[in-house]
Design a protein with these regions (language model features):
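C-terminal active-site subregion of NodB/CE4 polysaccharide deacetylases
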Residues: 1-55, 61-62, 118-195
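Active-site flanking residues adjacent to catalytic metal/cofactor-binding acidic residues
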Residues: 56-57, 108
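Short, glycine/acidic-enriched loop or turn micro-motifs at the edges of active sites
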Residues: 60-61, 112
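Cell-envelope/glycan interface and biosynthesis
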Residues: 64-65, 76-77, 82-84
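Acidic (Asp/Glu)-rich catalytic clusters
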Residues: 68-75, 89-107, 163-164, 181
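Short beta-strand and adjacent tight-turn residues that come in two discontinuous sequence segments
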Residues: 81, 109, 170-172
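Structural signal for hydrophobic
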Residues: 99, 106-109, 131, 187
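Substrate-binding clefts and substrate-entry loops adjacent to catalytic sites
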Residues: 107-122
Length: 195
């Protein structure tokens, strides 16, 4: 989330976010698409020097009003993981379609933002599949292969549920770097806040 909520460490200030994106551009970092990340992790595909993947969870309104224009300004690919069940309270379908049409990858964060680790395999499949259906119907994204676990929460059924629901790669909340050979259903990310 990007905004000016100084008391919430889950929110990065807009000025710092702009500085960070400028730093990436000025210092030769190369933002990758999810497909490029997947090919690197699973198949060992080459990636450019200084690779970085920009992901944004939950689909807050600022994703459209702040993040999206900055991504367009710098020409950076990015992925936004949304909960279709929350559409209308944060983003609208029109905003999601516009971002998708203009190079932002829209991906699955579950129909509802619920902890997957608290659900049976069948309920996990249902939460993922319902979101897949909404992405196909509302945005035209058929067979979306990317998922981000709400709260980063998983259990022993989650990898299997993800596969059965058509997911090829799942993003975790644990901090770390992605490497060739990593479990594609447990891709680590680095939290970036007001630092």
């Amino acid at each position: 989330k990007v905004g000016d909520d100084k008391d919430n460490d889950a929110v990065i200030r807009e000025d710092l976010f702009r500085e960070q994106m400028k730093f990436l551009k000025d210092n030769g970092y190369n933002p990758l698409t999810m497909e490029q990340l997947y090919e690197y992790v699973v198949n060992g595909a080459a990636v450019p020097e200084k690779p970085v993947v920009l992901t944004f969870d939950d689909g807050y309104a600022d994703t459209y009003s702040i993040v999206y224009p900055i991504m367009k300004e710098y020409g950076f690919p990015a992925t936004v993981f949304i909960n279709p069940g929350d559409i209308g309270t944060r983003l609208t379908w029109d905003q999601v379609r516009e971002m998708h049409k203009n190079g932002i990858t829209i991906a699955n964060h579950g129909f509802q933002h619920i902890e997957m680790g608290q659900l049976s395999e069948a309920k996990q499949i249902e939460n993922i599949t319902k979101a897949q259906e909404a992405l196909a119907k509302e945005v035209g994204i058929k067979d979306n292969p990317w998922f981000c676990y709400p709260y980063g929460d998983k259990n022993e059924f989650t990898d299997s549920a993800s596969k059965k629901a058509g997911i090829k790669m799942g993003m975790a909340m644990k901090s770390g770097w992605a490497h060739t050979g990593d479990n594609p259903y447990n891709i680590l990310r680095v939290w970036v806040g007001n630092a």
